[in-house]
């Protein structure tokens, strides 16, 4: 006999609760969803498939933000679209808060105008570049300037 999986899931959601953000359970262990342990101290983790699903969800959110705020980004070539997505994913797009990629007014204007060297220079002179370091930032600057990701 096979158990009723739908009924079990409903019962567990009632008993455990469903929390869609990380929280500490009654014993202080980091948990998410319906009692899913993510606390590394107890061996908690998420499987790669869940990580990929979260990444897909985040990328779709970033695309929606960019489509609404700067629809011209879709006219960029593939590499420069990837850079815009990467930077927005990394820094966020938060018009009502400082620190997001939306604050890069000169760089965004350079991208929109096809002034690739200016866009790269704008990235290099930013706080973001200093914070993440050249190892992470320089490949994106070069990609903006050349339209190629170098390995």
Predicted features and spans:
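Long, amphipathic alpha-helical surface segments
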Residues: 1-21, 36-40, 50-59, 63-67, ...
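Residues that flank catalytic or metal-binding motifs in active/ligand-binding sites
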Residues: 8, 26-28, 80
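Mid-chain, well-packed structural core segment of small domains
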Residues: 73-102
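Alpha-helix N-capping/helix-start residues
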Residues: 5-6, 48, 75-78
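Surface-exposed patches in mature extracellular/periplasmic domains of secreted proteins
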Residues: 20-23, 67-80
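Helix-turn-helix-type domain boundary/helix-start signal
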Residues: 44-45, 74, 109
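Substrate-binding/active-site groove segments that recognize
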Residues: 24-43
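Structural recognition of the beta-strand scaffold that forms the well-ordered cores
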Residues: 11, 31-33, 83-88, 118
């Amino acid at each position: 006999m096979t158990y009723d999986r739908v009924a079990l899931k409903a019962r567990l959601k009632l008993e455990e609760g469903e929390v869609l953000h990380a929280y500490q359970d009654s014993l202080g262990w980091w948990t998410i969803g319906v009692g899913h342990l993510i606390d590394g101290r107890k061996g908690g983790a998420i499987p790669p498939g869940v990580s990929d699903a979260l990444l897909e969800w985040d990328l779709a959110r970033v695309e929606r933000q960019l489509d609404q705020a700067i629809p011209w980004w879709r006219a960029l070539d593939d590499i420069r679209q990837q850079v815009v997505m990467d930077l927005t994913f990394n820094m966020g797009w938060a018009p009502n808060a400082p620190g997001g990629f939306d604050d890069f007014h000169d760089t965004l204007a350079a991208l929109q105008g096809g002034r690739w060297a200016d866009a790269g220079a704008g990235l290099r002179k930013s706080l973001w570049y200093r914070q993440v370091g050249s190892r992470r930032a320089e490949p994106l600057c070069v990609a903006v300037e050349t339209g190629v990701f170098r390995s």
